[in-house]
């Protein structure tokens, strides 16, 4: 099973013979394709096909077949039914030597096949066991969901998928309607093929302009033997969420200031809150104070403001941390009494963790997942709560679920930071530094990452990298001291905190 979410195709141009060979390999991945077999399918000589594969794909046909097998195995482990066995997946993909499969899988993806499978089972079980309830969308994006086109053999499946998708979108806070004239966006789809060759394709289009906003493709069986359709619909809704949210934000940006509603102001603030940097934070709080002045009971604006004021303390944006912490606490208590959707609840969970109130944070994150089990933000914040409670294994699972759900979300980098922090807590300092360096590469303005990345380098024995890291930290925060780091540090276990502060002292950060 293969699922993709994208806005524009980046697929390379291929010759007809290479495409034919690829189609043949994908249609029968378990077959031991020889070069002669592929040449017969492609209609060219083996030497020509070999040369074209190297020219277009940079690899031999055998290497490409192995890539296809591993990608298929990974997707089946990520999206298959709960009772799927790892060994059966490997054999079905033509990877018959299980020991070699496990070693190569870990080299490619940084985790074992069993870890991928465990995460999938955790997610499906969470969806099945959480009592779902709806919170009516307030001033949210309106989407019309058209019928999913399918042949007679897939007609019933198409109707079930459309029904589950409508429910998943509504749980995610999207207003789903049947009249196109009332909608900002139109979501349509098709189902083609059968069995393992089934393909579900969805397209999200802006109604006013006809512009394609996003697309989603799922390859794999959709019958009763596959994962529950509720699970697939939840994943689709989660993958579309960043694009839908961006469409809302762009709509708010296009409005004249005189026409802005509290929701519009909250949406304008959101990308600045998500930036997790000082400039963005200052712009966000301005928008959010305006929103709350117009509607003191606006749940999203209040939750975002609580988080934004908490960021000022934790990320050292503030000259008055005590005042900002008090303002964050006041707003968080107020937001907890308002009826927010899954997005507002996940944001509120962020605010409570920065206030070191892990019980309240855990409660609202559970509520967020009860509303929308596919909320990547809620899964990620659940991972942070596990980090703060010292449960590295559970934290990494939750962060990776968040990344599986919405790999292109603006907050995805913060899940990478979280994985790094979880590895640090487990004593895997080299891995901790590697994940946090990856996060910093994706979001260079978040220089506060050096606060925990530098100690990871110190404890991993990487002295040159540690010196470069602390230099970058002090360039951004020239007056920063260990006392200020202690004041703004998240609620990590005491042993974790001591390691960080001692390492920062060792590389020269003043007390």
Where are the regions that the model predicts?
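Alpha-helical bundle regulatory/interaction domains
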Residues: 1-60, 68-136
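Short, flexible, glycine-rich and Lys/Arg-enriched loop motifs at helix boundaries
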Residues: 2, 79-81, 313-327, 485-490
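Short, amphipathic alpha-helical "lid/cap" segments that border enzyme active or binding sites
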Residues: 18, 229-233, 237, 497, ...
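Short beta-alpha connecting loops at secondary-structure transitions
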Residues: 57-58, 84-87, 413, 417, ...
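Short, basic-rich loop-to-helix N-cap that marks the start of a DNA-contacting helix
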Residues: 63
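Acidic, proline/glycine-rich low-complexity intrinsically disordered segments
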Residues: 130-438, 445, 450-457
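TPR/TPR-like (Sel1-like) alpha-helical repeat modules
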Residues: 458-481
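Terminal, low-structured helical/coil segments at or just beyond the last alpha-helical repeat
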Residues: 482-511
């Amino acid at each position: 099973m293969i699922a993709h979410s994208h806005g524009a195709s980046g697929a390379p141009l291929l010759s007809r013979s290479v495409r034919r060979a690829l189609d043949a390999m994908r249609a029968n991945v378990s077959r031991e394709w020889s070069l002669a077999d592929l040449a017969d399918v492609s209609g060219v000589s083996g030497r020509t096909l070999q040369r074209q594969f190297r020219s277009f794909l940079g690899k031999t046909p055998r290497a490409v077949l192995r890539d296809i097998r591993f990608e298929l195995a990974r997707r089946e482990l990520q999206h298959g039914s709960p009772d799927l066995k790892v060994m059966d997946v490997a054999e079905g993909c033509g990877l018959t030597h299980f020991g070699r499969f496990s070693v190569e899988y870990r080299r490619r993806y940084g985790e074992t096949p069993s870890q991928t499978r465990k995460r999938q089972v955790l997610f499906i079980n969470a969806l099945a066991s959480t009592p779902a309830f709806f919170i009516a969308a307030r001033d949210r994006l309106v989407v019309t969901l058209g019928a999913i086109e399918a042949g007679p053999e897939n007609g019933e499946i198409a109707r079930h998928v459309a029904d589950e998708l409508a429910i998943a979108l509504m749980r995610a806070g999207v207003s789903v309607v049947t009249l196109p004239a009332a909608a900002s966006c139109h979501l349509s789809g098709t189902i083609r093929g059968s069995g393992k060759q089934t393909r579900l394709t969805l397209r999200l289009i802006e109604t006013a302009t006809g512009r394609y906003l996003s697309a989603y493709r799922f390859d794999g069986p959709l019958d009763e033997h596959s994962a529950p359709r509720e699970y697939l619909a939840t994943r689709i809704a989660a993958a579309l969420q960043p694009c839908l949210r961006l469409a809302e934000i762009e709509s708010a940006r296009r409005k004249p200031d005189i026409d802005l509603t509290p929701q519009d102001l909250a949406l304008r603030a959101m990308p600045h809150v998500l930036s997790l940097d000082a400039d963005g934070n200052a712009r966000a709080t301005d928008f959010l104070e305006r929103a709350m002045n117009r509607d003191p009971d606006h749940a999203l604006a209040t939750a975002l403001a609580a988080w934004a004021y908490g960021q000022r303390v934790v990320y050292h944006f503030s000259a008055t941390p005590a005042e900002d912490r008090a303002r964050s606490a006041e707003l968080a208590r107020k937001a907890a009494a308002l009826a927010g959707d899954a997005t507002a609840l996940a944001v509120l969970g962020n605010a409570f963790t920065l206030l070191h109130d892990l019980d309240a944070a855990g409660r609202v994150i559970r509520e967020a997942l009860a509303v929308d089990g596919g909320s990547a933000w809620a899964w990620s914040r659940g991972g942070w709560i596990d980090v703060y409670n010292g449960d590295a294994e559970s934290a990494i699972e939750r962060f990776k679920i968040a990344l599986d759900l919405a790999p292109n979300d603006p907050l995805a980098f913060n899940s990478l930071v979280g994985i790094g922090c979880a590895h640090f807590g487990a004593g895997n300092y080299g891995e901790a530094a590697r994940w946090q360096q990856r996060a910093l590469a994706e979001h260079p303005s978040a220089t506060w990452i050096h606060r925990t990345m530098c100690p990871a380098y110190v404890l991993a024995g990487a002295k040159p990298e540690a010196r470069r890291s602390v230099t970058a930290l002090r360039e951004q925060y020239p007056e920063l001291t260990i006392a200020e780091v202690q004041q703004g540090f998240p609620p990590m276990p005491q042993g974790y905190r001591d390691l960080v502060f001692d390492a920062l002292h060792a590389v020269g950060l003043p007390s």
